[in-house]
A protein has these predicted regions:
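Structured, active/binding-site neighborhoods that engage oxygen-rich ligands
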Residues: 1-219
Length: 219
């Protein structure tokens, strides 16, 4: 494996955001995932992956970050509607056995929001809100299947209190990560909120890391 290629991937905003939130021993695991993905993308299933549940989820979300970087809408040669669907469908496909309606919606929504943050403005609450808010056309493209998804799309993470958040499924995970991201002004502030909230859940931690990386580290 070309070490320069791995370093290039590790410098991506989403990957950098994840790295900032991981303990040192898991950063090495992340680099291993990048190497595997560049060498044999799509070959390993998560059910075959060795390691702890934390390791499996880190692998899944690292693959999501790599997928979004490859298929960003400002880099695709596809028509916008096809590029958007490619972005969302590829994200949802990473769920494997976890594919419920709400979980599929969560991954599709997260892919859209990360892409918008990467391509959007910086430095203000309005820029952050613009990156997280779907247009009418984007909501139609999302085509949410779960009745619970609409509240998250409309910004439940702006209004809920800390004790109203959960982590029961992927939609809850995305909502909790969005809450930490919205209620903080720096990556470090969000990390502090994360620790007080659901910091032990690797899924919330890594999703927040991607959101923060897309907004704070993209430049």
């Amino acid at each position: 494996m070309n070490s320069n290629l791995i370093l290039d991937q590790a410098a991506m905003p989403l990957i950098m955001g994840i790295c900032c939130l991981l303990p040192a021993e898991q950063v090495g695991e992340l680099v291993t995932v990048i190497a595997e993905e560049e060498g044999r993308l799509g070959v390993m299933s998560f059910t075959e992956a060795e390691g702890t549940p934390h390791g499996i989820e880190l692998r899944r979300l690292t693959r999501l970050a790599l997928h979004i970087d490859r298929h960003r809408l400002d880099r695709t040669v596809l028509p916008i509607y096809q590029g958007r669907e490619q972005l969302m469908a590829g994200a949802a496909a990473l769920l494997d056995e976890d594919m419920t309606l709400a979980c599929g919606d969560a991954m599709r929504l997260l892919a859209l929001q990360l892409d918008k943050l990467l391509r959007g403005g910086r430095g203000s609450a309005q820029a952050k809100l613009d990156g997280l808010t779907l247009s009418v056309m984007e909501q139609r493209a999302l085509a949410a299947q779960s009745p619970n998804t609409g509240a998250v799309v409309r910004g439940s993470w702006r209004r809920k209190s800390r004790n109203q958040l959960g982590r029961g499924n992927w939609l809850d995970v995305v909502e909790a990560a969005l809450w930490c991201f919205w209620h903080s002004d720096t990556l470090q502030d969000g990390e502090a909120l994360l620790g007080a909230l659901l910091g032990a859940d690797i899924r919330v931690r890594v999703v927040y890391g991607m959101l923060a990386g897309a907004f704070y580290l993209a430049d």
